[in-house]
Design a protein with these regions (language model features):
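Glycine-rich phosphate/diphosphate-binding loop of Rossmann-like nucleotide-binding domains
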Residues: 112-116, 140-191
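A glycine- and small-aliphatic-rich helix-loop capping segment at beta-alpha/alpha-beta transitions
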Residues: 171, 226-234, 286-292
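Conserved acidic residues
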Residues: 208, 253, 267
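C-terminal binding/interaction regions
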Residues: 1-39, 46-57, 68-148, 159-160, ...
Length: 307
């Protein structure tokens, strides 16, 4: 199965249909709820709902998801019934397969209950397809429409001294690159408050996004938050709340992060944890919001300006 552990949860909905063709007298039986086996539409609705809830047991590589809503509705025509299934969840992946499975099994249930009333060649299913979906990467974009200049500053005495390689900062650079940020300034600093303050103020004149990596913990040398928080003119607390909530589901140590985010003039500053896992998890949680911020606020600074 595909690993969806690093995908943030979001509201998702999918709508699917299936069409069952049948002789007109069978469609009338559906309207009356009067087949040999009982009310076919009511029975099929229950079957479709159960199918949505158990899709992961039927389709081998489909992820189990909490189903918050599963509905099956019908449109009865002269010689066919259109089955429409709607499924909703809040999760890391979509419910397209759940909606398709619900529509399919509802159709098969109706087929089973109508077959005593007609010849086999008079019943067939068609046009089982997804009608629409909402949520996830198709709705919450993770790639910029236009490039945005970003800077990544790694704060670590040991990395700056060459005693340990940087992995967290490079993972942030990689994520930003994949999201369309360009150019990206990358720099390593020791945990020195004045050096960090001066660099961030200078970079804020040319870079719309400044990401610091490291110095958000509770150690004596963790000076990033104490240095940058007083500089923030407009705080954006929701970014780090999202990052901590996402991280807390993966490690209890996420609660120790003091990270902050906000604007210095028109430059967004975000302080990330210094561990590879903490930085990666934080980026996974906040990237859709980052992309939205910079797609909306097109007057943010960029070297050379925007055309």
């Amino acid at each position: 199965m595909k690993n969806v552990g690093m995908k943030p949860e979001s509201y998702r909905v999918a709508e699917a249909q299936a069409i069952l063709y049948a002789p007109p007298h069978c469609i009338e039986l559906l309207r009356q709820g009067n087949t040999e086996k009982g009310d076919a539409l009511k029975t099929a609705r229950v079957a479709g709902i159960l199918a949505a809830k158990r899709t992961d047991e039927l389709i081998p590589l489909c992820h189990p998801l909490p189903i918050y809503r599963a509905d099956v509705e019908y449109e009865l025509e002269h010689d066919f019934v259109k089955i429409i299934a709607v499924v909703e969840t809040i999760g890391p992946t979509g419910v397209e397969m759940e909606a398709l499975t619900a529509a399919s099994l509802a159709g098969l249930t109706i087929y089973d209950m109508l077959k005593p009333h007609c010849e086999p060649e008079e019943l067939w299913m068609d046009q089982c397809k997804l009608l629409k979906k909402k949520g996830g990467k198709s709705h919450f974009k993770r790639v910029l429409r236009q490039p945005v200049a970003a800077a990544v500053i790694v704060l670590s005495d040991t990395v700056a001294a060459g005693r340990k390689p940087d992995t967290a900062g490079k993972s942030v650079v990689e994520t930003l690159t994949e999201a369309g940020f360009d150019p990206i300034h990358y720099q390593i600093l020791p945990d020195e408050a004045d050096t960090l303050k001066n660099l961030v103020l200078e970079l804020s004149k040319s870079y719309a996004c400044i990401m610091t990596v490291g110095g958000t913990g509770i150690g004596k040398r963790d000076i990033t938050v104490d240095t940058l928080e007083p500089l923030l003119e407009r705080k954006l607390d929701g970014l780090m709340e999202a990052a901590r909530s996402f991280g807390q589901k993966r490690t209890p140590y996420a609660a120790m992060s003091r990270g902050v985010a906000g604007f210095i003039d028109r430059s967004l500053v975000v302080t990330l944890p210094g561990s590879r896992g903490g930085a990666s998890e934080s980026m996974a949680a906040i990237l859709p919001a980052l992309v939205h911020i910079f797609d909306v606020c097109r007057d943010l600074p960029h070297p050379g300006g925007y055309e």
